[in-house]
């Protein structure tokens, strides 16, 4: 019997998740792998034997947040020297061994393709090893047969592919998540039907470039058709796609099938063709607008959201104004808007000067946010009087007497809990809601009797 086997012990695992929905899904993968290794989950870092921080690397403030969190966990390590603390996810992959040079209470650094090794790595730490880093990228790992532990609720994320081949100059994802590889479509069908039988009503399909999915001759549109034909899931959503991968067949499926929600996240990033070329986005401003027109022509009641970066290297005021012009023309329902932030290892960091001042970036972001907030408000006001089929997802964050859910096109909607009904019996049901008022972020209405 080997040393590791003799000394093996388990314990309680606490996982704290930062960043995107795929990290949420990956935390479920980690939880499942640890459960298979006879560890139990813990809701509280104070009473845990192992703490994992599943991290993001998209922006600089994501790194700062993790450094601060690790420092704040130092007192637990002092109180219990046998506590194992690990950093997982994209920050782990991006920085690797460098994290051990920061004088942080840290034992493990493990990238997204290496989670199967976590139980073994923990035993190595407990056997006396220090500062273990494992950040190999895999060309094949999809965790296909690992069933993530389901969080209580009526909706779930399902990763269908991992990695990205686009290498946009500002983006760290190809370096932290590796090249594209897709899951077996039959495995995805099985997972989603299993979730449905456990009470899940809505799934969101995930991938760094989700609509480039292709496996065993099945493309993304083919996978959607399989899910519509072979599962009974009530609603299907997806994120994040690339504008270059929107075949007409996919849009027609959306137009013809109410279960495939008319809700598309279409990252613009910038509205000027020269800037888009510097970003290596593989489309021009005009081509992006053509995609939007085709989407709206085939799926008239679609909700379109986006991502936009301001202050990219060498972006002039006139080029920024081009972005504002595209935002006015497209009339996005909502946008995630950010100041450009250099990321270690990206081509933009290596080859382009970060030469737009912080003051200018902030001013541009404020201008963009103000414009989009106004557009979002008008878009929502235009929905007043309409009736939507809403899957009740939860109670409102502001009141237990308010329910909330999203329209098929993705707009968050809140409405009163009917008298004599409990929230627990209503969550998971689908109701017709008439919209009565709107803010820039939320529709408000009432359930039709």
Swiss-Prot record:
Recorded family membership: Belongs to the methylthiotransferase family. MiaB subfamily.
EC annotation from Swiss-Prot or TrEMBL: 2.8.4.3
Pfam families, alphabetized: Radical_SAM, TRAM, UPF0004
UniProt-annotated binding residues for [4Fe-4S] cluster 2: 164, 168, 171
Cofactor note: Binds 2 [4Fe-4S] clusters. One cluster is coordinated with 3 cysteines and an exchangeable S-adenosyl-L-methionine.
Catalytic activity: N(6)-dimethylallyladenosine(37) in tRNA + (sulfur carrier)-SH + AH2 + 2 S-adenosyl-L-methionine = 2-methylsulfanyl-N(6)-dimethylallyladenosine(37) in tRNA + (sulfur carrier)-H + 5'-deoxyadenosine + L-methionine + A + S-adenosyl-L-homocysteine + 2 H(+)
Molecular-function GO terms, alphabetical: 4 iron, 4 sulfur cluster binding; metal ion binding; N6-isopentenyladenosine methylthiotransferase activity
Enzyme class (EC, first level): transferase
Organism, scientific name: Leptospira borgpetersenii serovar Hardjo-bovis (strain JB197)
Primary gene name: miaB
SMART domains according to UniProt: Elp3
Domain MTTase N-terminal: 11-127
Radical SAM core domain boundaries: 150-378
Amino-acid positions noted as binding [4Fe-4S] cluster 1 in the UniProt annotation, renumbered to this chain: 20, 56, 90
A GO CC annotation given for this chain: cytosol
Protein name: tRNA-2-methylthio-N(6)-dimethylallyladenosine synthase
Cofactor(s) recorded in Swiss-Prot or TrEMBL: [4Fe-4S] cluster
Localisation: Cytoplasm
PANTHER family: CDK5 REGULATORY SUBUNIT-ASSOCIATED PROTEIN 1 (PTHR43020), MITOCHONDRIAL TRNA METHYLTHIOTRANSFERASE CDK5RAP1 (PTHR43020:SF2)
Function of the molecule: Catalyzes the methylthiolation of N6-(dimethylallyl)adenosine (i(6)A), leading to the formation of 2-methylthio-N6-(dimethylallyl)adenosine (ms(2)i(6)A) at position 37 in tRNAs that read codons beginning with uridine.
Quaternary assembly: Monomer.
PROSITE patterns given in the database record: MTTASE_N (PS51449), MTTASE_RADICAL (PS01278), RADICAL_SAM (PS51918), TRAM (PS50926)
């Amino acid at each position: 019997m080997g040393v590791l086997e003799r000394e093996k012990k388990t314990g309680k695992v606490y996982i704290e998740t930062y960043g995107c929905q795929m990290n949420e899904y990956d935390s479920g993968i980690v939880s499942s792998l640890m459960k298979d290794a006879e560890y139990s989950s813990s809701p509280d870092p104070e009473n845990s034997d192992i703490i994992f921080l599943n991290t993001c690397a998209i922006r600089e403030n994501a790194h700062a947040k993790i450094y601060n969190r690790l420092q704040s966990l130092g007192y637990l390590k002092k109180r219990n020297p046998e506590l194992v603390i690990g950093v997982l996810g994209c920050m782990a992959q991006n920085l690797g061994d460098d994290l051990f040079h920061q004088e942080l209470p840290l034992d493990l650094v493990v990238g997204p393709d290496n989670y199967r090794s976590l139980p073994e790595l923990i035993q190595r730490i407990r056997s006396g090893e220090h500062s273990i880093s494992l950040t190999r990228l895999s060309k094949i790992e999809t965790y296909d047969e690992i069933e993530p532990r389901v969080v209580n609720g009526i909706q779930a994320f399902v990763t269908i592919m991992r990695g990205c081949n686009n290498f946009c100059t500002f983006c760290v994802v190809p370096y932290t998540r590796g090249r594209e590889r897709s899951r077996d479509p039959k495995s995805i069908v099985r997972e989603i039907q299993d979730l449905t039988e456990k009470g899940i009503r809505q799934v969101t399909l995930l991938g760094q470039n989700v609509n480039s999915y292709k496996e065993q001759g099945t493309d993304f549109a083919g996978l959607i058709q399989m899910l519509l034909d072979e599962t009974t899931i009530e609603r299907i959503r997806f994120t994040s796609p690339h504008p270059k991968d929107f075949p007409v067949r996919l849009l027609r499926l959306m137009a013809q099938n109410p279960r495939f929600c008319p809700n598309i996240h279409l990252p613009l990033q910038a509205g000027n063709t020269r800037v888009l070329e510097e970003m290596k986005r593989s489309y021009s401003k005009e081509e992006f607008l053509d995609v939007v027109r085709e989407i709206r022509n085939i799926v008239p009641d679609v909700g379109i959201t986006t991502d936009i970066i301001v202050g990219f290297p060498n972006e002039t005021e006139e080029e920024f104004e081009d972005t504002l012009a595209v935002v006015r023309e497209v009339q996005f329902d909502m946008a995630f808007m950010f100041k450009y932030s250099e990321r270690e290892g990206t081509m933009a960091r290596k080859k382009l000067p970060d030469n737009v001042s912080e003051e200018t970036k902030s001013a541009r972001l404020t201008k963009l946010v103000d414009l989009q907030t106004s557009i979002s408000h008008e878009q929502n006001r235009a929905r007043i009087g309409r009736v939507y089929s809403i899957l009740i997802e939860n109670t409102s964050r502001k009141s237990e007497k308010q329910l909330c859910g999203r329209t098929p096109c993705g707009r968050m909607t809140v409405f009163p809990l009917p008298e004599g009904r409990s929230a627990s019996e209503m969550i998971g049901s689908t109701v017709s809601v008439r919209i009565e008022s709107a803010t820039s972020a939320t529709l408000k209405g009432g359930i039709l009797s």
